[in-house]
Amino acid sequence: IHNPSLFVYDGTYPYRGMLNTIKGRDEIGKIWVRRGTFRKGATRIPMDSIEHFDVIITPRDSLEEAKDDTQEIKAQVFDCEPIIYASEDDLNSRQHLRSRLGIPMDALVCYVQLGAGNINDIESDISITVSELAKYEDVYTVVGESMLGQSLEISGPRVRILKDYPNSVYFRSFDFAIIAGGYNSYHEVIRF
């Protein structure tokens, strides 16, 4: 039997089954890395979920909004910088990915990443995006394919597929990006 000493949940809202599993397990530490904050005046703050945790870590957002996280709770609350999966030292040169994918150094390069496609069908959105970008002869499109999703059926003379993780290590190669507004992608694009 596995007997963990620490449980860490990284997400927006804890699932009921998970909460039921950790409820009453006083022998383990319970940490919630709660991305996103509750807006001031929010009426749907999951107090019953918060009460299951000893520590709540709240990564700050790039845009500071008025928030009201001062609810009386028993958990310790810590703020930290936005969580990203690469550092400046990890970034490859502008030429690295362009050479690897056969993209001219003087081309405009757009990075497209619209999610894993596990929740929403993204293939048609990606097809439309790639078709629109193809109208510009000086633009190459690099589609970031999720490690979690199925392979995309996208091709074209100036289209490249990048299936790697984290793709943010290649951000110096791109001139602009079209991305899904997820926490990780947003903060990595803003940072790099």
Residue locations for each model-derived region?
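Short loop/helix-cap segments at secondary-structure boundaries that form the rim of catalytic
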Residues: D48-E51, A66-K74, L148-R158, V189
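Short, charged/polar "capping" segments at the starts of alpha-helices
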Residues: R16, K40-A42, L63-D68, I119-D121, ...
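A short helix->loop->beta-strand "cap" motif at the edges of active sites that frequently abuts
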Residues: R25-K30, F53-D54, K74-A75, E137-V139
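Donor-nucleotide binding loops and adjacent catalytic segments primarily
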Residues: N92-F176
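A nucleotide-sugar donor-handling region in carbohydrate enzymes
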Residues: R34-A42, S49-L114
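Alpha-helix C-terminal capping/helix-to-coil transition sites in glycosyltransferase folds
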Residues: H2-N3, H52, R172-S173
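Short N-terminal targeting/anchoring amphipathic segment
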Residues: H2-P14
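A donor-sugar binding/catalytic signature common to diverse glycosyltransferases
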Residues: Y9, D164-F192
